[in-house]
Amino acid sequence: DYCGPQRYTAVPDRLYRNRGDGTFVDVTAEAGVTSEYGPALGVVAADFNMDGWVDVYVANDGEPNQLWINQQDGRFENGALLAGVALNNNGSAEASMGLDAADFDADGDDDLFMTHITTETNTLYINNGFGLFDDRSARVGLGPTSLAYTGFGTGWIDIDNDGWLDLVIANGAVKTEEALLRANDPYPLHQRNQLYANLGNGRFEEASKRGGSVFERSEVSRGAAFGDVDNDGDIDVVMTNNNGPARLL
């Protein structure tokens, strides 16, 4: 088993401002981002409330998440609870790990997707255009099919080049009892990765079986990175695995 976040003391996140010359200065204290913190495993920056200023979202493992709203004067305030992204739809903090933001529904604002531990669904928060969010994980088809998995790396990418952003999730268990292991399974933490196809109507379907043999393989995946590795015009995926080789998709 891997040690959970309760074994460690959380420390405040840090914010570094780019000086514009390739160097950075620590502005954590003056920015006000030390007032609330948790065991953070994911971070993403975007203009969530559409005011022209970049905000910062932090995903915490087992504690409420933070949405640092840019106050336009160098300071940030945590607006996660008011915005509806501190907790899930049931009012519970989840084991947030993998995280990405994108305009998956093409309505002009960035939405949030994050992965969680086995028995917790992955979560999709849909932005209303003013920085308020609605947890629609179950309604869009991303809930029940994720319950058996522990997700780490994730990303929005258009896998099939149909103009709609799909989801790739790198999975791997952290506890043997969460791995739903079979009798005498020599690799109890291994899980298969997942691919969700965006249907273009606000809903998703799991398309892992159509994604090829890489989504049939079971490993202890912990991270994913995305880019056009071979310069052929489409997005490739690199997944890292504990006690195993990285995979290039």
What is each model feature region?
Residues 1-249:
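Acidic, glycine/proline-rich Ca2+-coordinating loop motifs
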